[in-house]
Amino acid sequence: ESILNEKANVLLCDVDRVALKIAEKKLSKFSENVIFSEIDIRSENSINQALDKVKSWNHIDGLVNNAAILDINNVDTINEERWNKVIDTNLTGALRMIQKTIPKLKKSEHPAIINTLSTQAFFAVNDSLAYSTAKGGLLMLTRSMAVDLGKHNIRVNAIAPGFIDTRMAYTESGEHEHEMESFKDIYIKNGKIPLKRGGSPEDCSGSFVFLLSNMSQYITGQTIFVDGGLSCTY
């Protein structure tokens, strides 16, 4: 919504049809500026079908890779199928999107790519083997792409959110992590998060707008932490 408020034209994609319908209703006032498309970034054909909806666009100014799935696992419980699904979605999917949009990004005067990481790209936690590995890989993909694409003036940066109120904030039992007593004790009462609260999507939106805009035209290969200071206390 913050990007649309900047008068941008947006292709908004999600693998979840229900989520797309909710977004379409929420963003109805921007109906002339946003196109919705179902997508599975593990599938090249699905990506092509989504991008066909904007084939009339002469160029693309920005790409935000925000797709991710979470799998609770560790070295004893993970299997290859679950591992591959997380890596393919959270890491390889971003590579596919970048490769598919590069031709039109090159035509932009100020092209930018943002990859959404996590604090877990930097700090390992229990039972998050595949997710943390994928996010760590996405960090290096961001830096490597910044080097590779600099010659085309394409900037590539990342945002690393902490505990943000999204669909992924709910546990398998349906409990919101911000409401868990363990979260309140460790992260709020004991100051693990210096700002003493969980974050919201609105807390993140300004960083996305900034990295897509000309205000960050000499910034590439960098990561902005949006975590209330959590990364300072690890």
Regions found by a protein language model. Give the residues of each.
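Active-site loop immediately N-terminal to the catalytic Tyr-X3-Lys motif
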Residues: D76, F123-L129, K151-H152, K196, ...
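Short C-terminal tail/terminal secondary-structure segment
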Residues: V209, T220-Y234
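Residue(s) in the substrate-gating loop at a strand-loop-helix junction
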Residues: S118
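Canonical Rossmann dinucleotide-binding motif of NAD(H)/NADP(H)-dependent dehydrogenases/reductases
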Residues: E1-L11
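Short, small/polar-rich loop/turn modules that mediate ligand/substrate recognition or access, typified
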Residues: G150, R155, I219-G221
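Active-site helix of classical SDR
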Residues: I98, A134, T142
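Substrate-binding pocket helix/loop in short-chain dehydrogenase/reductase
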Residues: N74-V75, R82-I87, K189
